[in-house]
Amino acid sequence: MREWKIIDSTLREGEQFEKANFSTQDKVEIAKALDEFGIEYIEVTTPVASPQSRKDAEVLASLGLKAKVVTHIQCRLDAAKVAVETGVQGIDLLFGTSKYLRAAHGRDIPRIIEEAKEVIAYIREAAPHVEVRFSAEDTFRSEEQDLLAVYEAVAPYVDRVGLADTVGVATPRQVYALVREVRRVVGPRVDIEFHGHNDTGCAIANAYEAIEAGATHVDTTILGIGERNGITPLGGFLARMYTLQPEYVRRKYKLEMLPELDRMVARMVGVEIPFNNYITGETAFSHKAGMHLKAIYINPEAYEPYPPEVFGVKRKLIIASRLTGRHAIKARAEELGLHYGEEELHRVTQHIKALADRGQLTLEELDRILREWITA
């Protein structure tokens, strides 16, 4: 597998989430936490969005983080001038190239190339130390020849080009094929960034395929928040990559902080962490079926793709249910210092199953039954 970096966009894409209304202090808290976690880039809202957005960009850029603070702006000279003045370490330009977005802004491909070069040239002269990325908005609904013409024209002048699945329609195969083609056009010097929306549930798979094909940067947000259904979630992306590059991922990021990041942003935007959320969801490491419970007691790797403790969470064994088995009951009894013969173990297991048929038992109720069974 290739090396890659994360551009976390919780403070840009995430601010476009319906329920998000981050204060300056919220943004500072998120940025510092992401920096401690090990995120390489933190993307913030365009400073031309509002007076407060500009102030926030300046504050975040001045924090002295290890992560590079970058801002995301439309490819316009006026926006670029403001972005340079904020002191950010990177400027991410975007220009719509699909027929839908060209109809909205009224430029054809030659005009897009001309204006992009003008804005890039300004940034290079005004702030030569700043990283520049150019992204074709709505990449995957753009004509391929148009895309490649734009990327080829700007590649000599930028550090990175971006591919954006703006409405989440791309398939993993499409992402792989297009990233490979863009890599061929821009050459080995220019980095490639992937930004994938999750409207059709492919954001994580698409991010992975982008890396497989040669992308070097992937955009994420905490909990995947963003416009509409959001984008590639940080936790989900790391779950995917950990199964393939465990040592690499563990070396780069302070993974045990992930629950803290998810809780923090959930609190700030007023939502609950989904029960089935990657890694930090309530049921992410729950085991209930008897066959699963037996295997987990013997070797957790049998039914877990990664150890929960790596990410600072714990597994949950649902022993007191109709699906339980004698191996799970025996293991729980032994944890309580209780020991049954084979016949008694079978009988108490069947008794617990019958009780659970009438309603879910709590662990406390199970423990009471096991203790009383010994003394009965």
From Swiss-Prot:
It catalyses: acetyl-CoA + 2-oxoglutarate + H2O = (2R)-homocitrate + CoA + H(+); oxaloacetate + acetyl-CoA + H2O = citrate + CoA + H(+). InterPro entries: 2-IPM_HCS-like, AIPM/Hcit_synth_CS, Aldolase_TIM, DRE_TIM_HCS_fun_bact, Homocitrate_synth, LeuA/HCS_post-cat, PYR_CT. Mg(2+) binds at residues 13, 195, 197. It holds the Pfam family HMGL-like. It is found in: Cytoplasm. GO terms for molecular function: citrate synthase activity; homocitrate synthase activity; metal ion binding. Keywords: Amino-acid biosynthesis, Cytoplasm, Lysine biosynthesis, Magnesium, Manganese, Metal-binding, Transferase. Its cofactor is Mg(2+); Mn(2+). SUPFAM superfamilies: Aldolase. Its EC number is 2.3.3.14. Coiled coil: none annotated. Disruption phenotype: Cells lacking this gene show lysine auxotrophy, which can be complemented with alpha-aminoadipate but not with diaminopimelate. Exists in an equilibrium between monomer and homodimer. Belongs to the alpha-IPM synthase/homocitrate synthase family. Homocitrate synthase LYS20/LYS21 subfamily. Catalyzes the aldol-type condensation of 2-oxoglutarate with acetyl-CoA to yield homocitrate. Carries out the first step of the alpha-aminoadipate (AAA) lysine biosynthesis pathway. To a lesser extent, can also use oxaloacetate in place of 2-oxoglutarate, leading to citrate. Does not display 2-isopropylmalate synthase activity since it cannot use 2-oxoisovalerate. This is Homocitrate synthase. It comes from Thermus thermophilus (strain ATCC BAA-163 / DSM 7039 / HB27). The gene is lys20.
